[in-house]
């Protein structure tokens, strides 16, 4: 239909202009039976005088393990989301690759134990208790 072709044209234009950065499939790795560990890492860094946080953020973003890098306000400078297959793999990444970077002053690693909602999608199937409750 004409309306559908207009939507595709708008999507193509938005991709060409860099407005749409990409598409992503959200996978429930637990349901898929795949070992996948996620961690949120808080970093305090020493920014460069001429480039601020951009240089160290770009260096960190280049690591394959890094899913996201965010400049934060508050108690720390950068927030990272890291993915790996085991807790040890992430711990080794922090110890061997992240912490040794000259501009990294400190790290605090928080392992994700369970995901309930991510990017607007619920991950847990709600169990509904359909028994009636009588209050006496």
Show where each model-derived region lies:
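N-terminal low-complexity segments that are often proline-rich with Ser/Thr-Pro
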Residues: 1-2
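A compositional/biophysical signature of low hydrophobicity enriched in polar/charged and small residues
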Residues: 5-136
């Amino acid at each position: 239909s004409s309306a559908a072709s207009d939507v595709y044209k708008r999507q193509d234009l938005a991709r060409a202009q860099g407005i749409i950065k990409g598409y992503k499939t959200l996978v429930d790795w637990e349901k898929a039976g795949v070992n996948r560990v996620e961690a949120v890492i808080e970093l305090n860094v020493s920014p460069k005088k001429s480039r601020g946080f951009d240089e160290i953020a770009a260096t960190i973003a280049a690591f394959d393990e890094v899913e996201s890098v965010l400049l934060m306000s508050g108690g720390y400078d950068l927030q990272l989301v890291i993915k790996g297959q085991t807790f040890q793999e992430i711990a080794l990444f922090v110890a061997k690759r992240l912490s040794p970077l000259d501009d990294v002053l400190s790290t605090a690693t928080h392992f994700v134990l369970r995901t309930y909602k991510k990017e607007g999608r619920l991950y847990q199937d709600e169990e509904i208790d359909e028994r009636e409750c009588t209050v006496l």
